[in-house]
Amino acid sequence: RDKYLPEILSKKEIENMIISSKNFSHRTMIMLMYSSGMRASEIINLQWRDIDFERNTIHIKHAKGGKDRIVMLSPKVKKALRMIDINRDGLVFKTNRGEKYSLRSIQLIVKKAATKAGIKKRVKPHSLRHSFATHLLENGVDVRYIRDLLGHANLQTTMIYTKVSKKDLSKIKSPLDII
């Protein structure tokens, strides 16, 4: 089957999604998915004890493929997380009824934020993960580091992101023009 590539969002589109999301928890989820490359399933299962506020890292346990991995905790997300829950016990994100979010509810939160931001693309939670990887790549981060942040076992999986990276080819100089 063809590999489905989620839509890549521009930095401005992501910023607009964050701004348009009025629910603080929902906004923090969107920020966290984009800033860390976490999957929706990892967001809904995230526990307070997995966040290291000192080292600015998040320990993702039993991710896809059964592997643990460490992702970065952005200072902006850290600040938002500190405002969410004073108890800091159990799940980080809970519904108004104190229950665990479903994957469907995360999809709807992301879709609603994209719609409110005026984005016409088909935006899914995975679009934020894909945009995270693509933007890192465009900023010159080595694809091997991106592989580790995404938790891919195989570099080939991460290499899919290089196909959609919109690095400006006109700015790349031929080696001949450098000598």
Where are these regions (language model features)?
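Conserved catalytic core of the tyrosine transesterase superfamily
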Residues: 1-179
